[in-house]
Structures are given as C-alpha cells and as structure tokens.
Amino acid sequence: MLEKRNFYINGSWVAPKKPSDIEVINPASEKACAVISLGSKDDVNDAVLSAKEAFKTWGYSTREDRIALLETFYTLYKKRWNDITDAIIQEMGAPKDFASKLQTGTGASHTKSFITVSYTHLTLPTKA
C-alpha cells in the first residue's frame, strides 16, 4: 500500500507537525489503496508563509522563465502519464481509458494551453 505522510513545503519534504493519518479508499473496490497524513493548522500556515515568500520573486519572474518552467513540467507530466493514470484509477476508482484519456489528459491539455497563452497573452508586472 502506498504511504505518503510528508508535505512538500518550501522546497523540502517535511513531516507533519501533528501526525494524523487517514486511509484513501478506492471507491471501485472499497479497499484502502494508500495512507496519507492530514495537515494541521500549523502545517497549512507553514505552507501559506512559504508560498507568500516564493511569490515575492515569482511575481517578477520573466515570461521566458515561466514558459520554461511550464514546458519542463509538461515534459515531466507526459513522462509520468502512466503513473498519474494509475493514481487516478486507485484513488477515484476510474476505468483505465477514462482515467488516461480524460482525467490525465485534461491536466496535460491545461498545461499546454497555459504554455500557448503565455507566448501571446502573458503580461507581467515590473518592479517599482
């Protein structure tokens, strides 16, 4: 069974401050397929503070940097297509074709759309 008990906060995987686990149930089989940790108020606060700090520089990143990041993400997403599909099958009980073509496909399609729009319509703020 898959166990994911840490959170990705401020560029690192960190243990929850107040561990509290829950099973993820596959609705098709009604069996547990994973164990995850629930975030506490302190975990959420840490994540929000980290995001606020990151936005200080991300908010002024260049169009080229953002597009490069999205393109890298898109490439990695396609490489992990089967892993993403398998996770959707387990966590949502979705049939394989539906999970792959529609659910996994939607994430790829949205990312590709963000890239396309970024080339032509992205306006970024400048530092004052």
Located regions from the model:
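N-terminal Rossmann-like NAD(P)+-binding subdomain of aldehyde/semialdehyde dehydrogenases
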Residues: 1-122
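A short, hydrophobic C-terminal helix/tail in secreted or cell-surface proteins
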Residues: 123-128
